Amino acid sequence: LIGLVGSEMCIRDRIEEFTDNMLSNDDYRQYLGNALPKLYLGWNNSFRYKNFDLSFQMTGQFGFKILNEPRAYYENNSIAYNRLKSVQKAPYGGQYTLSTAQKQTFVSYYLEDGDFLKMTNITLGYNIPLKSSKFVKNIRAYVSADNLFCITGYDGLDPEMSNSDIWSLGIDWRDKYPSTRSFTFGLNVSF
């Protein structure tokens, strides 16, 4: 059983008894990591050369753990449909068959490093040279990409998570869609 104490993840090997709705034996609790990143990284830069301009923004977070709940759910061998192929890797020492009472959700096997580095935006533009014009001052054509790539060892959809819910820090629930990658082609005209 795993539990959150602030932003720290703890695990218990067994539950001996319940007393006043609290687990009474803390002897088996182990520190497994922190749900909050130790380091946040942000970097943006822009370059200009003649009529070309290039700008980018990168973000990253390092030194934290994520509980991969979608993987735990879809690797649960007690359901007979919609399972991941990786269920055959047997996180419980060769035990392949689970009953519906055996949950894989909150076990340390699904706790992963959440470190990542993302290219959140990159834009390449070209200012089209104009001969003197009364009406148009500038024309710039550009191409832009958002969420171009993410370098991570995390097996889930996206290691970048919201830290707004204190009770869910570091847990990647099954309630989100993958981040959208978008490409934009544009033309700026100044009059």
Give the ranges of each region predicted by the language model:
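Repeated loop/turn-to-beta-strand initiation elements of outer-membrane beta-barrel proteins
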Residues: 51-54, 131-132
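Membrane-interface anchoring segments and C-terminal beta-barrel signals
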Residues: 46, 67-69, 79, 88-191
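Short alpha-helical segments and helix-capping/turn motifs at coil-helix boundaries
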Residues: 38-41, 126-128
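Short, well-structured alpha-helical interface segments that form or flank functional binding sites
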Residues: 36-40, 47, 119
